[in-house]
A protein has these predicted regions:
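C-terminal domain-boundary segment and adjacent tail
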Residues: 62, 171, 229-306
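Short alpha-helix boundary/capping motifs
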Residues: 89-90, 119, 151, 190, ...
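Hydrophobic h-region of N-terminal signal peptides that target proteins for export
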Residues: 12-21
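Catalytic domains of cell-wall/extracellular-matrix polysaccharide-remodeling enzymes
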Residues: 78-83, 103-250, 256
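Proline-rich low-complexity regions
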Residues: 34, 144, 179, 296-297
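Structural recognition of alpha->loop->beta junctions
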Residues: 91-96, 164-168, 281
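Active-site beta->alpha N-cap acidic-glycine motif
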Residues: 22-146, 225, 243, 259
Length: 306
C-alpha cells in the first residue's frame, strides 16, 4: 500500500469511530433566497408575498433558537435593491447567517470558469455590505444544483477560487426534492395533497441517509439539510422541525456540523450530477450505488408543468 493510500485508509478508519455519547445533529440550510422553488407565478414574487413567506419560514426557527444558514442569489429576484435588503435583514434579525449562491443561480455545467467566478463576485456586491453591517462574515458558498464541475479542471479551478476568496464549501448530506413539492403546492388542486405527502417523503429520505451514513462512513455524523425558501416550507417548518426532534436530532450551526471529521473525507466525484456528499463519498470508495427514495411521480409531473 502506498503512503497516499495508507493516509486515506487511516482517515476512513478514524472517521468511522463514533464518539462516546454521540447524538444526532443536523444543520438547517435554506437555498435560493429571497425565494426559490415555487416562484414561477408573478404574484409570489412581490415584496409583500416574499416578506410574508419569509416571516412565516423564520418564525419557528427564531422561536426555537435554531441556527440556520440561507444561501442568496441576488440576481434571481424582481425585488428592488432596498426591498431585497429588507428581506435579507429579516434573516439576519432571526439570527441567520447568509451565504453566497452565485448572482443568478449559475450552473457550473453550463458556465465557463471565468463567468462563474464573476457570478460569485457579483453576488458579493450585494451580500458583503449586508453581512458586514451586522458584524458577520460571508463565509459559506453553495454550488447551485450541487454542480461542482463537469470536468476535473473546472472543479479544481473553482475550488481554488473559493479558497482564495475565503469561502468554505457548504456540502449537503440530506438532499431531497422539496422544490418539486413546493411547485406542486402552488397549484390549488394539488395543495392539500402536497402538504399531506411532503413530510412522509422527507422523513423517508432522512431515514435512508441515516442508514447510508453508517454504510458509507461507518457511523452517523452531523448532517446538513438542504431546503428552499418556499411557501410550502414556510407552512411546514414547525412539522419538519418536530420530525427531526422525534428522530433524536438537535440543531447545530453549519460551521459546527462541518467540524466533524466526515467532512474531511476524500471526495473525487467529477461529472454533471448534483447530489448528496454521502453519495460522493460512496463513489470515491467504489461502493455500489444506492439512491434515496424518489419523489412521487405526480409531484414530478406537477413540477414539470410549472
Amino acid at each position: 500500500m502506498t503512503g497516499g493510500m495508507m493516509r486515506i485508509a487511516l482517515i476512513w478508519l478514524l472517521v468511522a469511530v463514533p464518539g462516546a455519547g454521540a447524538d444526532r445533529q443536523v444543520a438547517i440550510t435554506i437555498d435560493d433566497l429571497p425565494r426559490g422553488g415555487d416562484s414561477a407565478d408573478k404574484a409570489s414574487r412581490t415584496f409583500a408575498e416574499i416578506r410574508g413567506m419569509t416571516e412565516r419560514l423564520l418564525a419557528p426557527l427564531r422561536q426555537q433558537q435554531i441556527p440556520v444558514t440561507g444561501f442568496v442569489h441576488p440576481g434571481r429576484t424582481e425585488l428592488a435593491a432596498p426591498d431585497l435588503r429588507r428581506i435579507l435583514d429579516l434573516w439576519l434579525d432571526a439570527g441567520a447567517d447568509l451565504g453566497n449562491h452565485t448572482w443568478s443561480h449559475a450552473d457550473l455545467n453550463r458556465t465557463t470558469v471565468a463567468d462563474y467566478e464573476q457570478e460569485i463576485l457579483k453576488a458579493e456586491t450585494v451580500l458583503l455590505p449586508v453581512v458586514k453591517a451586522r458584524g458577520k462574515q460571508l463565509e459559506f458558498f453553495r454550488y447551485p444544483m450541487l454542480h461542482t464541475g463537469p470536468v476535473a479542471e473546472t472543479k479544481r479551478a473553482i475550488a481554488e477560487f473559493l479558497a482564495a476568496h475565503g469561502y468554505r464549501n457548504a456540502p449537503v448530506t440530506f438532499d431531497n426534492s422539496d422544490y418539486m413539492f413546493a411547485a406542486a403546492y402552488t397549484r390549488p388542486e394539488l395543495r392539500a395533497r402536497a402538504a399531506q405527502e411532503y413530510l412522509p417523503y422527507l422523513e423517508s429520505v432522512v431515514a435512508f441517509f441515516e442508514r447510508r451514513s453508517v454504510e458509507v462512513v461507518g457511523r452517523e455524523f452531523p448532517q446538513i439539510m438542504l431546503m428552499h425558501a418556499s411557501e410550502l416550507n414556510s407552512r411546514m417548518m414547525p412539522d419538519l422541525l418536530a420530525m427531526f426532534r422525534r428522530r433524536g436530532y438537535r440543531f447545530v450551526a453549519l460551521g459546527e456540523a462541518l467540524q466533524d471529521a466526515a467532512y474531511r473525507l476524500p471526495e473525487n466525484y467529477v461529472g454533471p450530477g448534483g447530489f448528496s456528499w454521502i453519495h460522493r463519498w460512496s463513489m470515491t470508495k467504489g461502493m455500489p450505488n444506492k439512491g434515496e427514495p424518489d419523489e412521487p411521480e405526480w409531484v414530478r409531473t406537477a413540477a414539470a408543468k410549472r
